[in-house]
Amino acid sequence: MEVHKETDQITDNTPTILGISCFYHDSSAALLKGTEIIAAAQEERFTRKKFDKSFPIESILFCLDQAKVNLKDIDLIAFYEEPILKWDRIYNTNLNYSRKLNIGKLFNWFNSKLRIEDEIYKNLKDYKGKILISQHHLSHAASAFYPSPFKESTIVVLDGIGEWACTTIGKGIDNRLELLAEQRFPN
């Protein structure tokens, strides 16, 4: 935090981050100031569609309203998984195990997920900033470690599946996360 002597205005240099999850199940958004969660919501709360996978525009608007900010105040948007790595798993798994690929479903997934940055900019026209694409298990680790009171922690992520990883072990120290080992699909 800085105080500008000329204006006595306080400037907070802590980044404001909008996290987005969509196009799979349980679309949601969360707004953070640094590592503090300011607001979070799942899209189904607003649409009343169970497991809603659409772009979480209502959740985003809710988070912005709760934090009393607009898209121009957002320093970074984070997306929860690396689509190209997930595409690699889906394509190779289906290619190896399915005699008849559902090309339509794969195309729809390809169109929305692999072009997620375009989708975000299209749906959030006022946002001109950066987009961070994070590995799925790193997203889980960050969501648990950063808001915790711990400066150091062992991290274990047990998940149905991320891009390829089903289980990941790592560590968090201060503001750093390191994933050390993973068990990959299909094992």
PLM regions and their residue ranges:
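Short acidic/glycine-rich loops and adjacent helix/strand connectors
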Residues: M1-N187
